[in-house]
């Protein structure tokens, strides 16, 4: 259960390269959100390295509220996506991108352009949880990649759904995901579509 290695190590890069970083409290300890039971204890130990007077009870309360909000967000995304996908007479495009691709300055309005052709658009978050574990041709350890592969696999029994993958030039790891998603889709008789985004600010 890992996140993007580039993003995960931004704090390390800052600490090593920004001289003024030593003058501020830069917290970049490693915590696993997937271990819900252990998280409050580890978060409490981490916070006590930097601040005084934070009790374990307070951290447990905050963690409980945070997890509820986290899971609630995904439930809302899935519910809205399912509502969109079930509209009568509409083809569905699973527009799969990294989390930062929801930023209009990055995605260039590609979602709106595709929607203008009369299709419904959902994200991979909506359907990825419907798939049980399955074999992949690559080491499947990153959170986003797991959702992406699961979404592609789910489409095998969905004739009205197709997947479009957004890829940024700067993401080297997507050299792996694009090949695997292509293999999954083509093995299921689907056409793989990739849109590679550069760093301009319009279409």
Predicted feature locations:
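An N-terminal assembly and electron-transfer interface module characteristic of large anaerobic redox
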Residues: 1-203
